[in-house]
Amino acid sequence: MKALFFSLLFLSFQAFGQPLFLVSDEEMLASNANKNFFYPKSAISPDAPKIELVSPKLDATISSPTQIQLKFLPKTPAITKPETFRILYGTFQIDITERLLKVATVTAQGINVPEARLPNGKHKLILNVQDSDGRVGSRLIEFEIK
C-alpha cells in the first residue's frame, strides 16, 4: 500500500509540470532488494522480431536523463505492431508502458525517448513487441544509472 501511495504521489507531481521519472526510487529499491528474478519458461520463436538497443551504450557510464533508442527488426514479410510494445520494470515486472508513452515516440521501426529519467542505481527492463504474424520478441536490458 505504501508503494502504491508513493506511486500515486509521484504521478501527481508529473501533472504539475515536474519531470516524469519512469520509475520511482521505491520501485527501484524494492526491485533490487529481491534477488529472485523471473525468467519466462517459454522459448521465443527464432522468427520473432528482434529488439536492438541503439542508445544508451551499456559499456559506458549512464546518467539521468538519458536517451533511450530502440530499433525493432521484424522478420520479413512481417511488420512490427508498435501498439503491442510493453516495457516491464525490475524483479516485479511493473508495467511502465503508459509512463514511457508519455515521453516517447513509438513507430513500427522502434522507439525514441529523448530524456528518460531514472533514479541512480541498477535497473532491469524487459521489452516486448509483437509482429503481424503474432510472434513476440523480447529483450532483457540491465544497466546502472550513476
Predicted feature locations:
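N-terminal signal peptide c-region/cleavage motif recognized by signal peptidases
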Residues: 12-14
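Short beta-strand edge segments in extracellular beta-sheet folds
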Residues: 142-146
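Surface-exposed, short loops/turns at beta-strand junctions within beta-sandwich domains
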Residues: 115-122
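Solvent-exposed loop/turn segments flanking beta-strands in beta-repeat/beta-sandwich domains
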Residues: 75-87
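Short, compositionally biased P/S/T/A/G/V-rich stretches that sit at domain boundaries
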Residues: 18-66, 73
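Aromatic sugar-binding surface patches on proteins
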Residues: 103-112
